[in-house]
C-alpha cells in the first residue's frame, strides 16, 4: 500500500537531496540513478537484468580499452545464475547473445506495442532482437502474483511482481537475523588503530553510534565515496581507504540517449514493463565501429507525467502546444540506449563546502564525456533512427540523457590502482568493505543491477569463507 499509482507521489522513492553537479557534461542526479528506500534503487528500477559480455571482464587485455577486472567471467557466471534464480528472471528460451546458458527461471513476458515496433524495425534492418530479461514475475512465485502490466514499474510495484531487493534479498536476510534500521542517515565511520570500530548514524532526531567488528559500505557510487571522504580523521586525513586518492574517482554513468517518433497505429506503450524488447547487436559486434565499448537499446514506455516532462524539457513545449502533443501519447514510440562510458580519473565524487540537514558536507560530482564516448553516442543515435524509420516511424527527434551509476571505489588487483581488492575489502582498512556498484572498474553496455547483485553474492561468499578460516 506504500506504492501508489501516482507518479508525483512516488517521487519519494528517489534520492533528491541536494548534490552539486558540474564538469564539462554535468549529469542529472535523482530518479534516473538513485533510490532512498528500503531496497534502494531496485524499488524503482525497470528490472532489466543483463549479464556482461564475458570479454568486458578483461577489456584492457582482450579489447584494448578500459581496465581488467580482478574477477573472471567464469567466476561471475556462477553468481549471475545465483542472482537470476533469486530474482526469478523472466526471459526468452534462447537469449541470442553471449555464451550458451541455461533457461531463465521464468518464461518471457508477452510483447507490447512498443516492443513490436523495435522487433519490426530490427528485422527489416537485419539486426537480431529478443525479449528483454526482466526481474518481474511472469507466473506466480510463492505468495507473489505475476505482473499485471500496469506500467508503474518505475514508481514502485504495488503487487510485488517486481523482484526488487525489498521482496527478495532483504526478507531472506531478516529471516537469518539481520536488522533493518530504516529512516536513518549514516554520517561517519569511526576508526581506531587503523581499523573501523563502528558507524555514527542519525535516526529519530538524534545521532547514535553502532559498534561493529566489520563495516560494509553499500551506499552506491555517490554516497559510499561521500561517506568515506566525510569520515576523514587524524589517522586517515584524506578520508578512509583513500591513501592513493582514488576514492570518488573513475565515476561512470551509462549514456541513455533516446530517439522518439510516432506511428499510425495505436501503440499504448505504457501497457507492460517499459523495456520489453532489446537488441544487444552493438555489444557483441565490433566490426564497423569507430569507438571502443558497446551499447544495447530497448523499447520504451514512459508514463504520462514522465512523458509530458520529457517533451516539455527536450522540445521546449508548454501550454496548449504541449497539450496538443500529449494527444499523440498512444501513438508514440521510442528507443533508448544503455551505452558504455569510459572510466576517467577526472570523473569523480568529492565533498563540497555546503552541508545538508544533518550537518554533513554534500557531494560534488564532476563529469565529462571522452571523445570515444561521443563517437559511441553518435553511432547509437543513427542506429536507433534507422530502426525506427524501418519500422515506419515519422517525426523523429532525440533526447540526451544518462542513467545508472558505477565506479567511485573501484576494485582491482593492485593497491596503487584501486580502493579495494577483488573481495571488496579495502586495501588500507582490513575490516572495512565496499559492496555496491561503486566497485565496478568498467560499466559495460548493459544495465548494471544484475552485475551488482552477482558481485554482492560473491563478496558474501568470500566473507563467509574467510570467517570460517579465521582470517577475519
Describe each region flagged by the PLM:
Residues 1-18, 35-48:
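Conserved N-terminal glycine-rich FAD pyrophosphate-binding loop of Rossmann-like flavoproteins
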Residues 10, 22-25, 60-186, 405, ...:
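Conserved redox-cofactor binding core of oxidoreductases
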Residues 43-64:
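Periplasmic solute-binding protein
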Residues 1-2, 159, 175, 184, ...:
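Glycine-rich loop(s) and the adjacent beta-strand/alpha-helix scaffold that form part
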Residues 18-33, 41, 45, 69-73, ...:
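FAD cofactor-binding and catalytic pocket of flavoenzymes
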Residues 30, 208, 219-220, 243, ...:
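Secondary-structure capping and boundary motifs in well-ordered enzyme cores
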Residues 442-463:
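A conserved FAD-binding loop/helix module that cradles the flavin
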Residues 131-138, 142, 146-155, 160, ...:
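A glycine-rich dinucleotide-binding beta-alpha-beta segment and adjacent secondary-structure elements
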Amino acid at each position: 500500500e506504500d506504492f501508489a499509482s501516482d507518479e508525483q507521489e512516488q517521487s519519494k522513492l528517489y534520492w533528491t537531496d541536494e548534490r552539486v553537479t558540474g564538469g564539462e557534461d554535468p549529469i542529472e542526479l535523482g530518479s534516473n540513478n538513485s533510490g532512498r528506500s528500503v531496497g534502494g534503487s531496485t524499488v524503482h528500477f525497470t528490472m532489466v537484468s543483463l549479464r556482461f559480455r564475458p570479454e568486458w571482464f578483461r577489456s584492457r587485455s582482450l579489447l584494448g580499452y578500459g581496465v581488467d577486472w580482478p574477477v573472471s567471467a567464469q567466476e561471475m557466471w556462477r553468481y549471475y545464475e545465483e542472482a537470476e534464480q533469486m530474482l526469478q528472471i523472466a526471459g526468452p528460451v534462447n537469449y541470442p547473445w553471449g555464451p550458451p546458458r541455461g533457461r531463465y527461471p521464468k518464461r518471457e513476458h508477452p510483447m507490447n506495442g512498443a516492443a513490436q515496433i523495435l522487433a519490426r524495425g530490427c528485422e527489416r534492418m537485419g539486426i537480431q532482437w529478443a525479449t528483454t530479461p526482466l526481474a518481474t514475475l511472469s507466473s506466480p512465485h510463492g505468495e507473489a502474483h505475476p505482473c499485471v502490466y500496469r506500467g508503474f514499474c518505475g514508481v514502485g510495484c504495488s503487487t510485488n511482481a517486481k523482484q526488487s531487493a525489498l521482496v527478495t534479498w532483504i526478507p531472506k536476510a531478516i529471516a537469518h537475523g539481520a536488522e533493518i534500521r530504516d529512516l536513518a542517515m549514516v554520517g561517519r565511520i569511526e576508526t581506531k588503530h587503523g581499523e573501523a570500530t563502528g558507524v555514527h548514524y542519525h535516526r529519530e532526531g538524534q545521532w547514535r553510534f553502532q559498534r561493529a567488528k566489520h563495516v560494509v559500505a553499500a551506499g552506491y557510487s555517490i554516497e559510499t565515496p561521500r561517506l568515506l571522504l566525510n569520515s576523514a580523521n587524524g589517522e586517515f586525513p584524506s578520508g578512509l581507504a583513500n591513501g592513493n586518492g582514488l576514492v570518488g574517482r573513475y565515476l561512470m554513468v551509462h549514456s541513455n540517449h533516446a530517439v522518439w517518433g510516432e506511428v499510425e497505429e495505436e501503440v499504448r506503450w505504457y501497457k507492460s514493463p517499459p523495456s520489453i524488447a532489446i537488441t544487444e547487436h552493438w555489444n557483441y559486434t565490433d566490426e564497423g565501429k569507430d569507438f571502443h565499448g558497446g551499447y544495447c537499446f530497448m523499447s520504451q514506455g514512459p508514463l504520462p507525467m514522465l512523458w509530458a516532462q520529457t517533451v516539455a524539457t527536450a522540445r521546449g513545449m508548454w501550454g496548449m502546444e504541449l497539450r496538443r502533443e500529449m494527444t499523440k501519447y498512444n501513438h508514440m514510440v521510442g528507443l533508448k540506449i544503455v551505452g558504455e562510458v569510459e572510466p576517467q580519473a577526472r570523473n569523480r565524487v568529492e565533498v563540497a563546502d555546503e552541508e545538508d540537514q544533518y550537518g554533513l558536507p554534500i557531494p560534488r560530482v564532476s563529469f565529462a564525456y571522452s571523445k570515444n564516448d561521443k563517437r559511441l553516442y553518435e553511432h547509437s543515435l543513427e542506429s536507433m533512427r534507422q530502426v525506427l524509420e524501418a519500422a515506419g516511424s515519422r517525426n523523429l527527434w532525440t533526447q540526451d540523457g544518462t542513467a545508472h551509476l558505477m565506479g567511485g571505489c573501484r576494485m582491482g588487483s593492485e593497491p596503487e590502482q584501486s580502493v579495494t581488492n577483488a573481495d571488496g575489502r579495502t586495501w588500507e582498512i582490513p575490516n572495512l568493505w565496499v559492496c555496491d556498484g561503486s566497485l565496478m572498474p568498467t560499466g559495460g553496455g548493459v544495465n548494471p543491477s544484475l552485475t551488482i547483485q552477482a558481485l554482492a553474492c560473491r563478496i558474501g561468499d568470500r566473507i563467509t569463507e574467510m570467517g570460517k578460516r579465521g582470517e577475519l
